[in-house]
């Protein structure tokens, strides 16, 4: 069986925490920011844990990470 390939696009967007959780950045902070409140933009900066429903897909796309 051939080696599994890592999904390079996802590998650049996801980091793994020390406890093994997958971390990602929030979407929506690149442009069209003038209509968003200060609080909303501040909250978009934060890193969040990948939702449990998506963890299986992430593990499949990142077999060696």
Swiss-Prot record:
It comes from Caldicellulosiruptor bescii (strain ATCC BAA-1888 / DSM 6725 / KCTC 15123 / Z-1320) (Anaerocellum thermophilum). Keywords: Ribonucleoprotein, Ribosomal protein. Pfam families: Ribosomal_L35p. Gene3D superfamilies: 4.10.410.60. This is Large ribosomal subunit protein bL35. HAMAP family: Ribosomal_bL35 (MF_00514). InterPro entries: Ribosomal_bL35 (IPR001706), Ribosomal_bL35-like (IPR021137), Ribosomal_bL35_CS (IPR018265), Ribosomal_bL35_sf (IPR037229). PROSITE patterns: RIBOSOMAL_L35. Signal peptide: none annotated. The keyword Secreted does not apply. GO terms for cellular component: large ribosomal subunit. One of its GO terms (biological process) is translation. The gene is rpmI. Belongs to the bacterial ribosomal protein bL35 family. GO terms for molecular function: structural constituent of ribosome. It comes from the Bacteria.
């Amino acid at each position: 069986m051939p080696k599994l390939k890592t999904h390079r696009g996802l590998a650049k967007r996801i980091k793994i925490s020390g406890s093994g959780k997958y971390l990602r950045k929030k979407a929506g902070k690149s442009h069209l920011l003038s209509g968003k409140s200060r609080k909303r933009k501040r909250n978009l900066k934060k890193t969040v844990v990948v939702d449990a429903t998506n963890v299986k897909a992430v593990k499949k796309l990142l077999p060696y990470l």
